[in-house]
Amino acid sequence: MQKALSILIPCYNTYCVELVRQLAEQCENIEGLHYEIIVADDGSCDEHIRMRNKEILELDYVVYLMRKENVGRARIRNFLAQQAQYPTLLFIDANMVVPRADYILNYMQLSDSTRVAYGGYLLAQGDESNLRYCYERAAGAKNQLKERIKQPYRKLRTSNLFILREVVRQCPFDENLHQYGYEDMLLGVQLQKANIPIVHIENPVLFYRYESNAQFVRKTEESLRNLFLLRQRIGDFSQLLNTAKTMRAWHVDWIYLNYWRRKQQAWKAQLCSKAPNLNVFKSYKLGYLISLFAATDSNQPTNGCHAV
């Protein structure tokens, strides 16, 4: 059984006082546990939320660090790991809820040999008109424990991640990623290459805040730009990337790209409507990714072929 824990919460424009109180209460109820909770505000632009989050300083063993500038999801996590005083870390996103009273205990009861563990996530009921909710719900079956165990390195999220500090030092979050998206998948690639096993358990956090459809489409485009930048390192981890590469290998990507360009604005409007369609979302993402490849091709001399 683990004896010490540093709970690390990266925060950006999110009120997280209730989450911190809940985690602190669970830690207090575990006899003999040495713990700390470190919240790092990553240069939030909402000053009201930054000030409200100072309420957590009323709690014992809680540290609140307010950064002046936003440094991104990877760098803030590396920073948190550097600040931790204990060798065992638990990353939780500030916009999550802990739905069970034994959440911390379940991680503490892991074998001392466990280096990385992931507990999964649940979805709070959302609106059928919300694209993010519909997308996460459709993906839910693939993220059940039995499915995660089949693909331990691909089914990993940093929003609920138990990891040893030494592993973060060996496989740090890539600070070249300044935008949102695919840092989880890249970590899975790094852990697999380092032969560091991931233990999957049923110990979820609850996802309950769903951004607007327009915001989610923008975040998706941002994440696809990350995926494109990481295309060599991620390899076959991404099914979407594999599809785009196959279409390029068969030289049919330009056909789809021309179709996507004609449909782009209409599809985007549909996704931002009150009845978003997941098939349209899938098609939009593929076209957007192919367009990134095409933009690179147009900046380089070719002999009629293009590199995958």
Question: Where are these predicted regions, by residue range?
Answer:
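Conserved donor NDP-sugar-binding/catalytic core segment of glycosyltransferases
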Residues: 97-132
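A recurrent flexible, glycine/aromatic-enriched loop bordering the glycosyltransferase active site
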Residues: 144-163
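Short aromatic/hydrophobic "clamp" motif used to bind/position activated sugar donors
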Residues: 89
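Acidic donor-binding segment of Leloir-type glycosyltransferases
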Residues: 23-66
